[in-house]
Amino acid sequence: NKKRLWVGTNKGLCVFYGDSIIADAHNYKLYNYENGDLPGYEIKCIFRDSQNRMWIGMLGGGFSVCNPSEDYRNLKFVHYSTTDGLVNNMVESIIEDKTGKIWIATQYGLSRFSPDTETFENFFFSASMQGNVYNEHGAAITEDGLLLFGTNHGVIVIDPLKVTSSPMTRNVILTNLKVNGITVQVGEKDSPLTQALSY
């Protein structure tokens, strides 16, 4: 953007203007874990969204976002990881759908991120574990808004308008009951249980 180049390396993110680096090979800025700018070293993907924000996916560091300024040497990043709700910190590709949501494909699962609310929804579209392992730079969007993601088992095609999140509900199962720190059984004197807990 604006002749600025963003290069992902295994040492971090390198940002520079193409013409200036020809004149001076040291005229660039390296953002990485060592200098405290990013939560990781190895950059797996770089994506510019419709708002011109830059999304940086890292191996083990989750992802970071910045609004590029003219001064490429002082970019400020906001970082997101599993602590914030991302499905996995090994980010492989990032893409935006037509509604402005950001999809983050990882080495185990897919996250849909809402930049406005900074919330995540996580998905596992394959019944097999290997089918939920996404490929590096393996994301694309079609003209009609379908998202394509490369996985270890082929391509997953997603219509973002039809994907709904269904909260998982889990049944509570009691396996043991203690009263005043002592396990009680059915049939014992003063036991509150009239039948086994498994019923």
Where do the PLM segments sit?
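Sequence-structural signature of mature extracellular/luminal beta-sheet repeat domains
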Residues: K2-L5, V15-Y17
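Structural signature of outer-membrane beta-barrel domains
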Residues: G12-C14, S111
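Residue-level "micro-hotspots" composed of small/polar
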Residues: S20-F47, M58-G61, V65, D71-K101, ...
